[in-house]
From Swiss-Prot:
The gene is IRC6. Belongs to the IRC6 family. Keywords: Chromosomal rearrangement. This is Increased recombination centers protein 6. The keyword NADP does not apply.
Length: 237
């Protein structure tokens, strides 16, 4: 039996040189000032049609491609499967976005949206539009490159009338299919008591659980252990 957990996590990741940009991005998009916390539980995404609870995962790394290599390992599959979306903040002049996405999409869940947020203000919107057109034909997931400036842009639409920057990211989240989640009418909200565990600890636990599972010779005991670990980790995912 395949367990279907709510896909209600949004990960925001930056490489170290752009941590300051990430701080402002989190405040502007999610109204979140808790940038020192790796997991912010029980956030609410709300628009005129619905409300949904989600957990905000916040992380940084020295090198995004190296981070992706770890994230696409088999041990991290339970974590990938509960991701509604992944937002990567970087300078696309320093990161090769096409190679990065091809590597990333090998393992990403088909319902997970991925947004690359470019913070290099020298990159023209025409270049962004060209890459997005290529990606729209190459991937089935919602994959998008977005230019984002810390100062509010004077133009919020491209030549095709499509939204830009933060407005476009909001639109992607608004139209996302919240798989296995309780989506509430805009007039109704429920309360939950959040559980907390650092993201790094969750990854370590997944790796340890996989090693132990492989060491159990009895298939019934192995299945029982797998179900026990799935239930335990679901409290924090």
């Amino acid at each position: 039996m395949v367990l279907q957990y709510p896909q209600n996590k949004i990960l925001v990741l930056s490489d170290h040189p752009h941590n300051f940009s990430k701080t402002q991005f989190l405040q502007d998009l999610f109204h979140c000032s808790s940038t020192g916390i790796s997991i912010v539980k029980d956030q609410t995404w709300e628009n005129r049609y619905y409300k949904v609870h989600f957990d905000l995962y916040i992380d940084s790394c020295k090198d995004i491609p190296v981070w992706v290599e770890e994230f696409i390992t088999p041990e991290c599959e339970p974590l990938r499967n509960v991701m509604a979306g992944i937002i990567l903040i970087t300078d696309i002049r320093q990161t090769k976005p096409q190679e990065l996405l091809h590597q990333f999409m090998i393992a990403a869940h088909r319902n997970t949206f991925v947004v690359l947020v470019n913070v290099n203000e020298e990159v023209e919107q025409d270049e962004i539009d060209e890459l997005n057109e290529i990606w729209s034909n190459a991937f089935t997931n919602v994959i998008e490159l977005v230019n984002w400036k810390r100062s509010k842009p004077t133009v919020n639409h491209n030549d095709y009338g499509e939204k830009l920057g933060l407005d476009r990211i909001q639109e992607i989240i608004d139209t996302h299919d919240w798989l296995n989640c309780e989506v509430l009418p805009a007039t109704k909200i429920r309360e939950e008591i959040p559980n907390e565990m650092p993201l790094e600890q969750i990854i370590r636990n997944l790796q340890s659980a996989r090693l132990k599972y492989k060491s159990i010779e009895n298939s019934s005991e192995a299945d029982a252990f797998a179900n026990e670990m799935a239930d335990e980790l679901s409290r924090y995912l």
